[in-house]
């Protein structure tokens, strides 16, 4: 033990929208408390992944322990638990907030409250955290701290009389923030005597020690060598190492209630140590686990195929390695008639999907082909059983099912009021249902719509940004499933269904999507020696067709004059050959055609 009583421990996190300066603020706090020497300091110290620093987002959680001597002369231990700010990782945010007693709400003085900040603030309020508003970037010429404070009070309803004006970049207000954490964030409850309960708020895989679990000890204490049990999975392990993060790991002998640290116990996979699970001792089990544990369910699926088949084994190995660190990633082998061998992968959301794809391409040098993202549909069969369908080609035929339900999300958009019209129009075209609209301070508005997730996953975000010149921010939450008139649109090339091009669309949009798809494919598929029909069909009913004409060789070139029957014979022979070729010939569908389908769905 570090010799600090529980009453002098403070656990807090930082809530902020992307780019509002959360990581820079964390850096300043580490410097101010002397946790990191000037020599070790580098920007965004807690964002350890190269991709995180480049995109400026925090994906995996980090934690750091700081020793701070306050103005009252006492030594305090401050545990900063970093949170990812992005909507796909809401569950991870909620777990890291559950590990704290307080939170700094960081808002950019020139931007104001954004949608994702709101979502995370609500999570913090659900966990009864003490929230300290911090208005960051007040050194910017466009900073309007008074407007932003008024907006926070109006939108969130927080009392901002004690809001701290700061600039993490220049170092203004850092001392005040540390003092506010000491004075306003309540200390953890002193429950050392109770049975051990530790909340896992993050875990990652280490090649030498197995899975390293980041925990907040809620009740009791734990020592190196103790036998522990994970309450959700029931697995038992022996602790090989305990320690605290200053951001680098430092081993200690024991951790007590209120402390934040890490433990290693030769755990083989991150799946066995799920975020939100409760750890307790084998010989003195806690009567019940900590509340709030949920299995992470993938919401968006897509096919990943290596562009050359000899990379299949490498792709499999790369996915397995990513899975060690990312329990929410799901994948299973898939065979496609057009693309060969690959994997069907499931993700939490769009950003999660992009990050995984980018990491596969960047860290493992893979060249990937990605099919259009789809969502999970619930299909009720004639016998009353319900199945989940994540791949359009697996949808049962119409005579075997009674209904298809699609996932619906509640989307909250915060935007300047002059763009309200175009954004409402966008939501209407995406089959949205209008729910609510509020005017905020200074000409900003929140819109709330219910939209099918399938319409959001393709390109809703990009279109939203382009229609509002980048000023809108959005956040979405799953609210459940709803039945609708959905059909599977198949693409037939030369009479054969190409499974990778099948999509599930709303019946009202099927004709439009089918027509534009076949027109696009006609441009991309090269001409063959025989004519190739491209059809879009719902079941057996063809709703759109284009034909690629055959390449024609002039068989009469060698006939000079001569009898017409001779020419006719050659033409008939060519016609017969074409017929035979059409019956046995295969159509080569180039890679660009599949990419075009993705782009088309985004238009």
Curated annotation (Swiss-Prot):
CDD domains: EF4_II (cd03699), EF4_III (cd16260), LepA (cd01890), lepA_C (cd03709). GTP binds at residues 19-24, 136-139. It catalyses: GTP + H2O = GDP + phosphate + H(+). GO terms for molecular function: GTP binding; GTPase activity; ribosome binding. GO terms for cellular component: plasma membrane. Keywords: Cell inner membrane, Cell membrane, GTP-binding, Hydrolase, Membrane, Nucleotide-binding, Protein biosynthesis. One of its GO terms (biological process) is positive regulation of translation. Residues 7-189 form the tr-type G domain. Its main location: membrane. It is a peripheral membrane protein. InterPro entries: EF-4 (IPR006297), EFG_III/V (IPR035647), EFG_V-like (IPR000640), EFTu-like_2 (IPR004161), G_TR_CS (IPR031157), GUFP (IPR027518), LepA_C_sf (IPR038363), LepA_CTD (IPR013842). It holds the Pfam family EFG_C. It is an enzyme of class 3 (hydrolase). The keyword GTP-binding applies. It is found in: Cell inner membrane. Its EC number is 3.6.5.n1. NCBIfam families: lepA, small_GTP. HAMAP family: GUFP (MF_03138), LepA (MF_00071). Belongs to the TRAFAC class translation factor GTPase superfamily. Classic translation factor GTPase family. LepA subfamily. Required for accurate and efficient protein synthesis under certain stress conditions. May act as a fidelity factor of the translation reaction, by catalyzing a one-codon backward translocation of tRNAs on improperly translocated ribosomes. Back-translocation proceeds from a post-translocation (POST) complex to a pre-translocation (PRE) complex, thus giving elongation factor G a second chance to translocate the tRNAs correctly. Binds to ribosomes in a GTP-dependent manner. This is Elongation factor 4. The lineage of its organism: Bacteria, Bacillati, Cyanobacteriota, Cyanophyceae, Synechococcales. The gene is lepA.
